[in-house]
Structure formats: structure tokens, C-alpha cells
């Protein structure tokens, strides 16, 4: 059975700073570990390259006013709250990470892989009209 792993080099932009557990290098470190263990050279493992989700895609889950707020905050690198920073880089990474979840599901649905791992996913503290717990959006 073929296994897909979603990854994009810009995932590492979801970095909340030195000493924080949400560091951007965690994505590179996981990929490096996979490489060191020979997982990425296995014939049944493929890296899936996600595309950033659109605003329209976000609106399937999130309120439009909330989505607009996050995009405005990103323009000026202002935080959403004390634990949820926003910047153009973090927003770009978030849209790609969510795109990774979409790509993983799509690859399974289309039969390109039997299973998939969406690196970076698990941002579950955001609700329809709020963020929190380091999460801008719910993936």
C-alpha cells in the first residue's frame, strides 16, 4: 500500500519563537528523521506537495469576519491573542498546512495512496469564529 506524506518547505514558517514548542524546525527535523531512517526512499512512500487553501475553502469552516480579521492581522504582524501570533509567514504556512490535510484526503480519495500523513496538522483549538491555543484555523 502506498503511503503519502504531505510536506512543504514553508511549513517551517509556522514558528512561534525560541523556546516555544511550536518551532518551525520541527517540520524539517521530522523530514530529516524520515530520510535518515530510509523511509523516503521506500518505493511505497511518496511526498505529497500541498497547495495553500483559498479564503473560499476557509469559509467552509470559519466565519468570514474571523477570516478577514486574521488576514488583516497578518498584514501588520499583530497577534490574535497572547498565545496566537499572526504574521504573513505564519498565515502562509497555516494555509499550506491546511492544504496538506486537503491533499492527504484527496490523494486517498483518488486512489493515489492508501494512507497519508499530513505533517503539521492538528490545529484543533480554533473554532468557527475564534482562534487560540496557537491555532489560527482548524484543520
Q: PLM ranges: what are they?
A:
Residues 1-139:
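HDAC/HDAC-like amidohydrolase catalytic core signature
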